[in-house]
Amino acid sequence: MQLIITTFPHPNIPRKLRIRVRHPKLSPIEFSIRCSSSTSSSMDAQNPPKRVVVCGGGVIGVCTAYFLSKGGAAVTLLEKSSIACAASGKAGGFLALDWCDGGAVSSLARASFNLHRSLAQELNGADLYGYRPVNALSLSITEPTSSSSSAKLNRIPDPNVPSWVDGPAKSPRTIGTTETTAQVHPHLFTKALVSKAVEEYGLKVVIGKLERVAVAEGAATVVVLEGGGEIEADAVVLALGPWTGKLSLLGSLFRVYGLKAHSIVLEPKEADAITPDALFLSYYPAQGGKPLDPEVYPRPTGEVYICGMSAEAEVPDDPEQVMPVPESIRVLKTVARNVSSHLVEGEATVKAEQACFLPCTDDSVPVIGEVPGVKGCYVATGHSCWGILNGPATGAAVSELVLDGSASIVDLTRFSPTRFLRGSK
């Protein structure tokens, strides 16, 4: 057995501290490192903190671990591969205050948008993970045919369209302002939370594969790892994203499927020309057919993130095995060059061609709450394309649920897994 315990320093420090320990008999928890003595030094031995194991190193699991550890719990974060290695590292990072209004996620989204703003102030998010308010525009683009490609040269600039968007864009409409829309770099955001929790709140990070949750007398007691390692727990949080269904404890209760989404990251030569305007496109291919709905997110890093081309697909066991479909990447590159001359080949470097799986439920509502019939075992998954937005409020709510017995930041009734029980309404 090889267990890798990783501690993450402050994001401004370029090197990670990675310690590899090999021992066939001892459990991973005995090798984990507490990087802050500030919490442990004041801990009352007669009133030990609640031991919580959070399974899943994506944004939902990390936000949950962050708020739990900040709230005084002794938290172990278990991740199979690496922090933010899946959708949380490859998402767009777009945040919206009111785009979920009128739906089941409205209160969660509003609370989380405001919590993102607070976290950015607390963690210096503008510098550490690219938090910033942005404008959002809806645009229509009809892909030019070869015979009409010269029309782009004669395009009259629209004052309502950012100057760098010099392709055949039409029908601009403002759908978000700096008061209602914002962005983060999701990978940097997730890593920043882990760093803060490790350094100041005693979070332990263990790299290992979850095999099962041991249940005794109707309560979760131990997290069992592949290879035989065990971590004792007073509570367990399962934030497994699209891998939720692979755990029999949850797969028998409800379905979470994976929507495979593709993205590319470009770095234009003239990055300063790109303004902080998120673009939501109705894109009509030259060959006809159903219009596409790609999204374009300029980042303060100087990069431009473009995503789209989503379809349900089988989720592989290993997140590192998720590979993009070449045709989907080709389409996104075509979209890029029709959006802006700054994004054509030769004017922009391709930094990433990637794919990830968004966790979706059959009723399009996240699953957040205690697992029916298993006291002390909680689930948080199924956030689809709004995982980065709703991560903070989900994490804060689950933390309250675990430590206090109920959540005050948002009413979790609508998200409870009990809705999947036969006869529930």
Predicted regions and their residues:
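Active-site substrate-recognition segment that forms the wall
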Residues: Y66-F67, G93-L95, D127-P133, A235, ...
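N-terminal chloroplast transit peptides
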Residues: M1-S27
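Conserved FAD-binding subdomain of flavin-dependent enzymes
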Residues: F67-K70, A74, K80-A136, T142-L153
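Flavin (FAD/FMN) cofactor-binding core of flavoprotein oxidoreductases
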Residues: S138-E143, L259, P326-S408, L412-K425
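N-terminal Rossmann-like FAD-binding beta1-loop-alpha1 element of flavoenzymes
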Residues: N47-T76
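Predominantly flavin-linked oxidoreductase catalytic cores and closely associated redox partners
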Residues: V184-I274
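Flavin (FAD/FMN) cofactor-binding and adjacent substrate-gating region
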Residues: E122-G208, R212-A219, V224
